[in-house]
A protein has these predicted regions:
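Hydrophobic residues at beta-strand termini and immediately following loops
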Residues: 1-2, 172
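Conserved nucleotide-binding/hydrolysis modules and their immediate coupling elements
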Residues: 93-202
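Conserved helicase motor core of P-loop NTPases
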Residues: 2-142
């Protein structure tokens, strides 16, 4: 793409992404620290020598950003790996504890007798597999797709009620629940084609 549609021309997100595409370094060799860039001051670059700082820094940024966000859907953590210290799995776990610690209505996702993750009312979630022809109790028929983000509104005996962005309320059957994952943190791949008010990258 060579025409900017989704972001202001003066945004550092644009200028820095162009540099990346051109194979240019964003910093000088060995530079560490925090710097806000762009005419709009809309990108914070934070570089450090110890990669173990990634997890801590992402958590701190997340805590700060959710204070100002209108919706948890506006704040997105994006990282490259599904497993590991600073991964989708570990960051979703801590983000849930920070954002939605008190919700008691929950549903555990099990695999081989082991809890993989817990879905709670109020959680931000992402659907990971297309599911067609879901019939809601009001008779409406809805499709959901891989990558759809939403908020859990209720958990019933046989379905999870999720308000999906751009779709609305969907009564997702419990049989599909293993494909509903926490969505506070997602991979770069899952984020393709999406847009968010605030992105925390690791």
């Amino acid at each position: 793409l060579d025409k900017i549609h989704r972001q202001a021309q003066k945004s550092a997100i644009i200028t820095e992404s162009i540099r990346v595409r051109q194979g240019k370094q964003l910093t000088s060799d060995g530079w560490t620290g925090e710097e806000t860039r762009g005419e709009l001051q809309d990108m914070i670059l934070n570089c450090y020598t110890d990669k173990s700082n990634t997890y801590h820094n992402i958590v701190q940024y997340f805590k700060e950003e959710i204070k100002h966000a209108k919706s948890i859907l506006d704040v997105q953590i994006i990282v490259p790996c599904k497993q590991g210290v600073s991964s989708v799995a570990s960051l979703n776990h801590i983000a849930q504890q920070i954002y939605n610690p008190k919700s008691k209505k929950q549903y555990k996702i099990m695999k081989s007798g082991v809890v993989q993750w817990v879905l709670k009312v109020g959680d931000k979630v992402i659907n990971k597999q297309n599911k067609y022809q879901i019939i809601n109790s009001d008779g409406s028929v809805v499709d959901i797709f891989n990558g759809n983000l939403g908020i859990i509104k209720d958990i019933k005996d046989d379905y999870i009620l999720i308000d999906f962005q751009g779709i609305g309320y969907v009564e997702v059957p419990k049989s599909h629940a293993p494909y509903i994952e926490l969505g506070y943190a997602i991979t770069c791949h899952s984020a393709q084609g999406s847009q968010f008010d605030t992105v925390i990258g690791g």
